[in-house]
A protein has these predicted regions:
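Classical nucleotidyltransferase
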Residues: 103-210, 272, 292-298
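Generic structural signal for residues in well-ordered beta-strands
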Residues: 3-5, 92, 152, 281
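Short acidic-hydrophobic, aromatic-tinged amphipathic segments that line or gate anion-handling sites
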Residues: 1-12
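Phosphate/ribose-recognition catalytic cores of enzymes acting on nucleotide-derived substrates
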Residues: 200-318
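Residue-level signal for inorganic ion chemistry
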Residues: 31, 84, 122, 183, ...
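A structural signal for isolated positions on well-ordered beta-strands in alpha/beta enzyme cores
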Residues: 51-53, 91, 121, 153, ...
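N-terminal catalytic cores of NTP/NDP-binding nucleotidyl/phosphoryl-transfer enzymes
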Residues: 12-76
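Active-site-adjacent structural elements in enzyme catalytic cores
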Residues: 51, 66, 70-71, 78-87, ...
Length: 318
């Protein structure tokens, strides 16, 4: 999977979706619960060779209803699209969540929007809601399927061995708490932050630890602190991603405060100029919280320890 940040319109996913088995949802994080729905859709398709499609919404409904909401996305649209593409989804119906859609009744959503999409079968989770004020439920959709030109299958929410439900909300809670390993377990992949490398104040270089920096953009803010990470730099759509071990500070740097939280990654045994490149930072383990130290010498000593701890954590987590 090449570490390329791409325009969803240039994805391999097509907008054509007639006669497909369609899964509907926001798919933020494309976690294990979402993947189970996609697997169910593929089983329903079976030997019929009907394609798998996804209907999703942009902007996220939470952003539409609360424009000032703090950043909360696990996977911005371009990242979500790439993951769905990699998972074998063939068609994507990207529905603009605007005032018209927010005011649409459940009946109109079923009988016009879904009928116009022309799927042969629709797959949803049990907590799927639609229509103004969430008046439509998954059960309502299935109850009306005899009157509609498609079948409907509902699947219950799944959980891990500790009864932790696979949900975007739960994953966000873990990320904000710094429990990245639990978040990654529910995701089924190691959560990443992707963005363009920007020019910083070169403070890390002066200390002997040059960093590649980027802003957090739409991404939910993880617990500020130091993380063991792996980093991939943009290449192309053919060459597999090459991941480098690294340590990263995510936050506002208490000793040298910044107005905006940054991801600052020190890539081990790496020296190339990365300004303007697209970078993916895969979070593996939260090592410690941010801390304001008294002197630069103390900071250098702490960074060295962070590097050792990160290397150890990465060796234990493949």
């Amino acid at each position: 999977m090449a570490p390329e940040k791409r325009d969803p319109s240039k994805s391999n996913l097509s907008a054509v979706r007639e006669n497909s088995v369609m899964v509907i949802g926001n798919f933020d994080g494309v976690h294990k619960g979402h993947r189970a729905l996609l697997k169910a859709a593929r089983l329903i398709s079976g030997d019929t060779e009907k394609p798998i499609s996804v209907m999703t919404f942009e902007p996220h409904p939470a952003k539409f209803f609360n424009p000032d909401i703090k950043p909360f996305r696990l996977t911005p649209l371009d990242i979500k699209t790439r993951i769905l593409d990699d998972l074998g989804v063939e068609y994507l119906m990207l529905s603009t969540f605007d005032e018209n859609l927010s005011e649409m009744t459940a009946d109109v959503f079923m009988r016009k929007m879904l009928v116009n999409a022309n799927p042969s079968h629709i797959v949803v989770g049990e907590n799927f809601y639609f229509g103004k004020g969430k008046e439509g439920t998954a059960q309502m959709l299935q109850d009306h399927s005899d009157e509609l030109p498609f079948d409907v299958s509902i699947f219950k929410s799944l959980s891990d061995d500790n009864n932790d439900v696979y949900s975007s909300t739960r994953i966000r809670e873990y990320i904000q708490a710094g429990d990245i390993q639990k978040a990654n377990n529910l995701l089924g992949w190691k959560w990443e932050i992707e963005g363009t490398v920007i020019e910083g104040d070169k403070r890390g270089r002066q200390l002997g630890f040059p960093t590649a920096n980027m802003t957090l953009g739409e991404y939910i803010r993880p617990a500020f602190g130091v993380y063991a990470v792996r980093v991939a730099i943009s290449s192309d759509d053919v060459t597999p991603a090459k991941w480098y071990p690294a340590v990263a500070n995510i936050g506002i740097r208490p000793m040298y405060p910044s107005n905006e939280p940054l991801v600052e990654a020190y890539i081990f045994d790496f020296s190339a100029d990365l300004y303007g490149k697209e970078m993916r930072v895969q979070l593996v383990k939260h090592l410690r919280d941010e801390a304001k130290l008294d002197t630069e010498q103390e900071l250098i000593k702490q960074i060295r320890q962070d590097c050792e701890n990160a290397r150890s954590a990465l060796e234990q987590t493949k």
